[in-house]
């Protein structure tokens, strides 16, 4: 990409192999890390882009636009890598909006998506420009990771690790006075499962040969 510092890339979600049975091309219909939104933002920063906009499509993303909209209200980063691989602008664009954007520049979105599946595909430049103005607030917080440990009875050079994050989205807009986002089908289920595994394994008369580690990080 020429002059990437002046460009905002518009990219498709998922891998080029989406919908394919050919597991030799990426991993076929199974998403690889290269199809994830985080990788696309990271790669955009590595290329020196001004920004990256991912075209949302339900099947490719695995969730509807409402999930993107809800998760865009806040973002958490670890201090040690908060400045790594971030473009000044990272975001998503609705499929129909991207379709109109490309049409305004003389391109058909479906044709371009099909062409992009070829290893020989090269990015195209659009005449459109984008102006963005936003205001952010930053807050630094500390949140502990939790770890539990059952010593092994035999081969203590090896460990089995059970992992589940105990928090996910933290706090949000109060619902009936409760602002905690409990995540009952996400982190709460994993923690309940992990605690029960710890209780059962610790109650065994004959302890497992390997060390058992229960790790619960603060974020997903």
Please give the residue ranges for each predicted region:
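Short acidic, glycine/proline-enriched helix-loop-strand junctions
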Residues: 59-98
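Solvent-exposed coil/turn segments that connect beta secondary-structure elements
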Residues: 14-16, 57-58, 152-153, 165-167, ...
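A generic structural signal for alpha->beta connector loops
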Residues: 49, 129, 209-211
């Amino acid at each position: 990409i020429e002059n990437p510092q002046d460009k905002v890339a518009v990219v498709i979600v998922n891998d080029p192999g989406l919908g394919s049975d050919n597991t030799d091309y990426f991993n076929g219909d199974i998403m690889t890390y290269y199809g994830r939104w985080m990788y696309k933002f990271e790669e955009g920063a590595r290329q020196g882009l001004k920004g990256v906009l991912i075209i949302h499509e339900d099947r490719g993303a695995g969730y509807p636009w409402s999930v993107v909209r809800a998760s865009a209200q806040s973002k958490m980063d670890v201090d040690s890598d908060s400045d790594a691989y971030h473009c000044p602008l990272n975001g998503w664009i609705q499929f129909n909006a991207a379709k109109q954007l490309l049409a305004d520049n003389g391109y058909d979105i479906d044709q371009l998506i099909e062409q992009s599946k070829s290893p020989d595909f090269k990015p195209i430049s659009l005449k459109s420009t984008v102006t963005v103005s936003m205001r952010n607030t930053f807050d630094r917080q500390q949140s502990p990771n939790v770890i539990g440990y059952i010593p092994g009875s035999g081969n203590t050079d090896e460990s089995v690790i059970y992992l589940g994050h105990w928090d996910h989205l933290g706090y949000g807009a109060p619902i009936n006075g409760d602002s905690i986002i409990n995540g009952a089908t996400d982190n709460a289920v994993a923690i309940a499962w992990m605690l029960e595994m710890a209780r059962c394994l610790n109650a065994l008369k004959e302890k497992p040969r390997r060390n058992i580690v229960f790790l619960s990080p603060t974020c997903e």
